[in-house]
Amino acid sequence: MNDELMLVEPFGGILRRTRRLPERFSGNSDSMDGCGPLRRFDDMKAYLEDTMRYTREETLPEGMVLATQFLCIRKSDNRLVGMIQVRHYLNDFLRTFGGHIGYSVRPSERRKGYASWMLKNVQPYCKSLGLSEILVCCLDTNEGSRRTILKNGGRFDGTAYRADENKTLERYWITL
């Protein structure tokens, strides 16, 4: 699969490929984890500008953490199959509920190993940030994400309940 996919940051011409992703997720119960603020934007230029704010301390919104957004593109047809976001460090909320990594795969592209590939291939970037392990969380009802995390060496660390969303998250650590 290494030759089939690539992780790229959403800048320049590649950004046009994200235009249809929110439509593909709408109507689903998906939270679009790993897509950054994409759901809030119709205008991709505005999305790009907002995403850039999370890459530098001087423009980072208050209470947020530095983050790098990646698109997962299938090379054979230049199709956007998923997104993954790396949070450079954890604040109190992310330490409990979000973790270092969030990811989503386009519903029509699921069960093809793309989430596992993204999680594996973003790990060298995490190491380059000085991280020795990463926290990855998933809903306790999301068997696919659980399998993805376990396939990448995830060690179960317990659960956390989000009362505001009435959801239980499973927490896993992956050693880099």
Regions found by a protein language model. Name each.
Residues 1-100, 165-176:
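GNAT-family acyltransferases
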Residues 78, 113, 130, 142:
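Conserved G/P- and acidic residue-centered "switch" motifs that form tight phosphate/ATP-binding loops
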Residues 137-138, 155-170:
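Conserved catalytic-core motifs of GNAT/GCN5-like acyltransferases
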Residues 136-146:
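Conserved beta-strand-loop-alpha-helix junction that forms the acyl-donor binding cleft
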Residues 102-105, 111-124, 128, 147-151:
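Conserved acetyl-CoA-binding loop-helix of GNAT-fold acetyltransferases
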Residues 126-137:
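Conserved GNAT acetyl-CoA-binding A-motif
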Residues 73, 87, 100-111, 139:
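A short, internal acetyl-CoA/4′-phosphopantetheine-binding micro-motif in the GNAT/acyltransferase core
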